[in-house]
Structure formats: structure tokens, C-alpha cells
């Protein structure tokens, strides 16, 4: 298949990408971002120049659409992963209109979406920077909505806030934070979340095209590729990896390199060899594996069964098969970690105990390893 975005663009894409590990210097931005906050750094530069930034946002019903504006207030909605198929209806036309009127534009989307934008625009624009990300696969909005309905039924309250990859329990826990109207808070980790485990474990939630993705590898269609830098602990020091999220940045074109130079004052970065990034980011070059369950049966059941029954039939969570040794280990780990985090500060020690054992609004489980720590 022809993966070139269009004829006549010239050689604007380099086959060899320059790779960097990076984090935003603003700790609040980094904490609120999916990884290290690099998309925010890029977006902030565009806003500063009076330009427009486009990407995926949650709608009120937690469906996802592509959106663009020149208002920095929208950055909080644009940053962070959504993990869902987004509706890009009308988005490409609006981008073209802005570009033709001379506006500076930075857009972000999946590799297939950004390749489609390249093809739609026909030519490259000097006032356009395209960002994509290393994509494992996009998930079904229908599955996600059923998951949210299940949570609302379980907690008897409407969801008023949802954030994937919340970092209160650490970047590597892949925690979804869910806040309900009745003030209850759920921290759903990679070991407890039916949505995360279904996505990463069964691989049945994604689009059929994701199992044979035509936009893996090189050349990249975007000027810049961003991602979680999984495996950062093996290549960078604690200055860039303290479990708060580290970004991998791939500079795929001269335009991408030049734009990256303009944000260096707002980030901490280190150039890393290309070979070092593949171990934790196989999705850069490899399509999603085929589902581990019958996909046809799964979606037929999705139309007729409650989500909790779907989960019981198709999804096996690690916490559902905890041994007594694992439970004991989790309890001991909790006691050790709160002592370390509290730094032998007795009031803070009891604060951690209270949050995890006696706070009704916070749903944690010590024996299951789902914990919440507060620091001084």
C-alpha cells in the first residue's frame, strides 16, 4: 500500500529520527501530563506565537473529538491520552483554512490520522507542525462507555471527572482516576481496571485496522513523535526518571528539529540512541497482536450483556488470583513505603494510614497493592 502522504511533497521526512528523553521543567504540567509534558511544551510555544493547537479532547459524555483553538485555557483538555477513537469530522478542513489564512498551527493525533491530514493537505506548509505519538491501538468508544456505565452503576453516582494515567500512585501504575458526583474517588490501576487490562491484556478493544497498522516504522509522517519513554530507567538518570513520567521525543524532520530547539528552555532533555528506545516501545514498529479472545463473540456479547458480565467472561485481572504470599507482600510493602514516604514523620505516617484505611471517598486496597501515598 502507498503510505506516502502525497506526491510532490519532497523529502521532508528523514528515515532516521533523532531521539531524546525529556521532561517539562514545570512540575505541575508534568504531573498533569500523560508522560513528561512534551506536548504541553510544544503547545505552549505555539500559543505564545499566537498560533492554534489541535488535538483530541473528551466531550461531556466522554466520547472523544478533535478540536483546535488559539486559547491556552484549552491546553488542559488537550493534554493527556484519551485511548479512544476520536471523531475528526471537520477538523482537517478547519486546519487547512487556518493554514491558508497564514495562522501558525500545531496539531497532534494518531499516526494514521496525521498521515491522513498530510494527504488531505496535499502539500507541506511552513506554518504547520505535525505531532503524532507511538500508538499501540485506539479503543472502541462503545466499550469505554459501557465501562463508565458499569462504574456509575457500581458507585451509584454520575462520573464528573475521568483521567487516564493519573500519577498520584506513580506513572508506571497506569492509574485511571475517577471522581463521582457523590464525592467518591476511584483509583483504578493496571492490575484492577477492567478497561486497562482488556486493552493491554486481551487486545480486543481496538479497531480491526490496528492489528495490521500501515503506519508503523519509518518514514514517520509527523515532524515530531512523542511517547512514554518506557525503559527510561535503563538509559537516563533520576533527574529524568523519578516515576513522574518521562517523554520520548523523536525528531523526524528538519522542521521538527528546529521547533524542538525553540522549547529547550522549558524542558530538561537528553539525547538517547535510537536503539535504546525500542525495548519499551515495540509499538513503534509492530502492530497490535491479534486478540486473545474471540473478537466477534465479544462484540456480540457487548450488545446484550452488562459490562460486569463481559468482564467476568473475557477479562482476568491479576488481583483476582492473588495468593496469600502476594497479599502479605503487598501489606509489608505498604508499611515500608509509608514509613519511607513519611520520613519518620508521625503525623504524616498516620495521614497515610487514614487515607488508605479509613477514608470512604478513596477506594484503595492494601492487600491488592492499590495504595495512595502523600508526601511532605
Listing of model-derived features with the role each one plays in the protein:
Residues 51-52, 157-372:
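Long, compositionally biased charged/polar accessory segments in the mid-to-C-terminal portions
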Residues 7, 112, 210-213:
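Short cysteine clusters
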Residues 2-13, 373-376:
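Single conserved hydrophobic/aromatic residue that forms the stacking wall/gate
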Residues 123-133:
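A short alpha->loop->secondary-structure connector
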Residues 33-37, 60, 107-117, 137-139:
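Gly/Ser/Thr-rich loops at beta-strand to alpha-helix junctions
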Residues 66-90:
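Glycine-rich phosphate-binding "P-loop"
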Residues 131-147:
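Short, flexible loop segments at boundaries between secondary-structure elements
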Residues 11-38, 43-45, 371:
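Electropositive, gly/pro-rich neighborhoods at or near active sites that engage anionic ligands
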